[in-house]
Amino acid sequence: MSSTAGYRIVKLANGAHSVHSLAHAETFHPVIGPVAEAEALYVRQLRLVKRVERHSGEFVVWDVGLGAAANAVTVLRVTRELGCSIRIVSFDHTLEPLEFALQHVQHLGYLAGYEAPLGRLLRDHRATFEDDRQAVTWDFHLADFPTLLAQPAALEFPKPHAILFDAFSPAKNPAMWTQPLFANLFRLLDPARPCAMPTYSRSTMLRVTLLLAGFFVGVGHGTGEKEETTIAANMLDLISEPLDRRWLERVRRSTSAEPMWEPLYRQAPLSPETWEKLRHLQQFLTGTGFFGKSANC
């Protein structure tokens, strides 16, 4: 279908449309489409409607990988009738996918009704608006995310209640999947504010990376084409199926488990040093981490 500025609209097997990046040779939200993936991976898994409904004050969502705005807009749509205050903080190194998407609203129907605030977001990197009963503040940071997180200014970002993590794959974008990045991300969380972060990958390497960064980690919900994904959180009770010691034993035998310490994609088994750190983590020393004490992963 149509192609401009390095992107094109593609029709998925289920009839939904999405954006394809020619430079990365990857499609945003492939197979089940933008809205279905956002609802399965983020909205339902994070129980966002219930959490926002019960929340007093401003509910903060970090949107890591704005792309064509499907994840953030889906969150706004499902919570717009709750009479709440919500702040979206989006991050990306480019606005080109969103600019392209807004030229193709006829194919990307999830954007309908949000053209005006998204136009302001493009122009001013901020939009404030009323969405049904909801008061929305939407901020955008145009920057290299790994570099941004390492700067002192990142400490001033509003602390999130939920994180939508949706970067291109580690093979195409390794800088977004390193252990130092997730360690910096975890450092920015408020330890007293429950926060969970799902992502589409189920790789052993990612799960080890998140654990060593400080997160509790569990099996995430399936998204149609994937039987499971991954969810990380700063509090164990936010995870319904935490990884257990049976998983830990499988990791020890894996040929692709060592985190990426630098932004260079490769696969390697655990080093002895990483194994020692991993097996002594709190998640595997508590009741949920012992054989037979948690959900089967």
Regions found by a protein language model. Name each.
Residues 162-164, 191-201:
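Conserved beta-strand signature within the Rossmann-like core of class I S-adenosyl-L-methionine
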Residues 1-59, 74-110, 117, 134-136:
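Rossmann-like AdoMet
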Residues 5-10, 106, 131-134, 151, ...:
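SAM/dcSAM-binding transferase cores
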Residues 160-176:
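A short SAM/SAH-binding and catalytic strip from SAM-dependent methyltransferases
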Residues 186, 207-233:
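Conserved Class I S-adenosyl-L-methionine
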Residues 175-194:
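A short glycine-rich, Lys/Arg-flanked "PGG" loop and its adjoining helix->strand segment in the class I
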Residues 100-157:
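S-adenosyl-L-methionine
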Residues 68-73:
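Glycine-rich SAM-binding Motif I of class I
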